[in-house]
Amino acid sequence: MSLNTHDVKRIAHLARIAVSEEEAEATLVKLSGILGLIEEMQAVDTSGIVPMSHSQDVTQRLREDVVTESNQRDLLQSIAPAVENGLYLVPKVIE
């Protein structure tokens, strides 16, 4: 894929970024390098390779879910300034 400075300026315009001519030229060089690398990677035959989700094949050791805290809802609602039907009432902020 080939880009030119017009393409870089168009992308910058769509992103609402102001770029000078020098910045567009520098960005063009960087983007062309990135796109060239992508083209090289796409040219590699990966038909016999299984895709990997992570660089290391590690499984996580899972633990059982255990309740570590008791339900303190009633205690917390007893010290709240205003509660109705189990819900905390707060002052109206927006009119």
Swiss-Prot record:
Allows the formation of correctly charged Asn-tRNA(Asn) or Gln-tRNA(Gln) through the transamidation of misacylated Asp-tRNA(Asn) or Glu-tRNA(Gln) in organisms which lack either or both of asparaginyl-tRNA or glutaminyl-tRNA synthetases. The reaction takes place in the presence of glutamine and ATP through an activated phospho-Asp-tRNA(Asn) or phospho-Glu-tRNA(Gln). The lineage of its organism: Bacteria, Pseudomonadati, Pseudomonadota, Betaproteobacteria, Nitrosomonadales. One of its GO terms (biological process) is translation. Its EC number is 6.3.5.-. It catalyses: L-glutamyl-tRNA(Gln) + L-glutamine + ATP + H2O = L-glutaminyl-tRNA(Gln) + L-glutamate + ADP + phosphate + H(+); L-aspartyl-tRNA(Asn) + L-glutamine + ATP + H2O = L-asparaginyl-tRNA(Asn) + L-glutamate + ADP + phosphate + 2 H(+). NCBIfam families: gatC. This is Aspartyl/glutamyl-tRNA(Asn/Gln) amidotransferase subunit C. One of its GO terms (molecular function) is asparaginyl-tRNA synthase (glutamine-hydrolyzing) activity. It is an enzyme of class 6 (ligase). Heterotrimer of A, B and C subunits. Belongs to the GatC family. The gene is gatC. PANTHER family: GLUTAMYL-TRNA(GLN) AMIDOTRANSFERASE SUBUNIT C, MITOCHONDRIAL. It holds the Pfam family GatC. InterPro entries: Asp/Glu-ADT_sf_sub_c, GatC. The keyword ATP-binding applies. Coiled coil: none annotated. Keywords: ATP-binding, Ligase, Nucleotide-binding, Protein biosynthesis.
